Amino acid sequence: MNDDNSTPLTVSVVMCTYNGEQFLREQMDSILAQDYPLHEIIVQDDRSTDDTWDILQTYAKAHPGLFKLFRNDEQLGFNRNFHTALLRATGEYVAISDQDDIWFPQKISKQVAAIGNADLCFSDYYTDLHYTLPLHNYVSPRTDFEHMLFYDCTPGHSMLLRTDFVKGIKLWNYDIYYDWWLSMHAQMGHGLVKVDEALNWHRHYDGSATTHVYRKGFYEAVPHPTWQPYAWGTLHRLHLQRKRNYRFFYTYLAQHIDRRKHPVPARIARLMLRHCPFAVLELCLICAKYYNRIYPGKPRGLKGRIRGFFYPLISAYGNDLFKLEK
């Protein structure tokens, strides 16, 4: 609520579509079933070739004034499409929606209640139809700045953000996942909060953008590694450091993280760019010292510190977060 406790804060929903006819109606119906009033539903279509656009027009006609539909003149890809669509939002907050998920009725109301003064709020989510699979398999329990420098654990489809925060980000690189970029800026700004409850069902299937990107991303990695990250993590790290988007990402963070406010994340960002063995050793020692902020698992004590020490190698092994680079 606003300061006068009478008018709900306005929330825009932003969805990007591409050939989403199979599940689009289910997601639209779940958005319309929210128990929180929506300011607008913005949908930006990336040149779909199926019936997606016709479905969108049907919903827009059934709900005059609520839907704002846009169709790109050329295909932008999901990263650029989401960024440009987010800039169209006019509500005080903006919620990001995939085209094929299902939102639970209290998703928006619970996130508006939780966000407080933070720039970003995200939540747990389910990925199975019966809502039974453990949530920790899909959202890391760690939301510390230090951990999120290694891992994108804030999925865009679960985000609610302050619109002025999104529009205040001046530099974007479309070879960096848009949701990771948003979460990093939130960490450098007024922070982020997490609702420890599943507020949507995220659908994984062969045609989804997420599934396509992740399949494209994995390289030289076994599905359930044991010793491999320790043996091959260094080589994978060197491979990542040669990628332009990797260097852009950590150079930007090294230059923009406030060293007085976030001394450890600032140091980690700088060390992620260095090649020499002493820099790797220093990074490993930092991760061992602050393992409770960095390592996503539950090990404590000596075991936790050992896992933390090797986390720079563990996180580099099979890392797919920089595979958008062409």
Question: Where would I find each of the regions flagged by the language model?
Answer:
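Short, well-formed alpha-helical segments that are part of the catalytic scaffolds
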Residues: 20-33
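Conserved donor NDP-sugar-binding/catalytic core segment of glycosyltransferases
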Residues: 106-135
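C-terminal subregions of glycosyltransferases and related glycan-biosynthesis enzymes
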Residues: 175-176, 181, 188, 192, ...
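Short aromatic/hydrophobic "clamp" motif used to bind/position activated sugar donors
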Residues: 94
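Glycine-rich, basic loop-to-helix element that forms the pyrophosphate-binding segment
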Residues: 72-89, 110
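A conserved acidic beta->alpha catalytic loop
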Residues: 45-54, 74
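Cell-envelope/extracellular polymer assembly enzymes that use nucleotide-activated donors
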Residues: 9-12, 40, 181
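Conserved nucleotide-sugar donor-binding catalytic segment
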Residues: 87, 141-220
